[in-house]
Amino acid sequence: KNNISFSIFKIEILLCLSSLVYTENLILDNQTLTLHGAHTYEVISLQNNSSIFVDSTTCKLLLYCDSLFIDSSSGIYANSISMNQNSMGSNFTDVGAGGAGGGYANLGGNGGGEVESSGGLTSGHLDSLSTGSIGGKGDIQLTAEDHMGGRGGGAVMVVSHSAKIYGEISANGGPGDDYYASGGTSIWDHGGSGGGSGGHIILNILHLEMYDGSLLSVRGGNGGIPFEGENAGEPVIPGGGGGGSGGY
C-alpha cells in the first residue's frame, strides 16, 4: 500500500512538472531577493550568502522549477511575517499575566503568571499550505502598542524535479516582546507576550538531496520575558509569555 501511495505521489508531481513552461532561471550570487506568490523557473540557484525572503503581502511563496540548488551559506526565509489570528494565543489584561503562544501543529504554550492565559489551538493540516499564528499580548494595562505577540512563520512550497540543499529553508515564528524592553513602566509588574507559531514548509521534490548542516525549520517563537517592577506593595508575580507551537 505504501509503495502504491508513493508511486501515485510521484506521478502527481510529474504531471504537475510536465505542465509547466520554464522561461528563465533565477541565479542569485551574493544577492538578496524578496518574493511572494507563485513563480516558475527552470533553475533556481542560491550561492555565496544569497537569500530569498518571503514578504508579508501574502506570507506565502510557491516555487516551481526543474532544479533547485542552495549552498551552505544561503537560504529561503519566511520567518516572523504572518499576522494570522486563526490560532492566536489569548491576550491577557490582568497586571502581570503573560500572553499565550500561537498554536499550529500543536497547542501554543500558556502564558505565565498567577492566572494563565490559554495557548492557541492546533490548526492547519500537514498538506495545507497555511501560515503560522501570532502570539497573544501580555497584560495590556498601559498601551496596546507595547508588548506585542510574536508574528507567525510564513509558508514555503517547492515543487521540483531535483534539489540539492546544503543551506536553510525556514518559516519560524517570532518571539513575543519582553514587556519592559518594549516601553512598559518600571513601577508595576508586567507579563511578557506570547511567541508566534511556526509556519509551513512543503517540499514536493522527486530527487531530493540534503547534506550535513542543511536545515528545515518551522519552530515557534519564544515567549517574552516579564518584568518585576519596583513597587514593593504590588502583590503580583509577573509571568512570561507562552512559547509558540512549531509548524509543519
Go through each PLM region and give its residues.
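Boundary at the C-terminal end of the N-terminal hydrophobic targeting segment
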Residues: 21-23
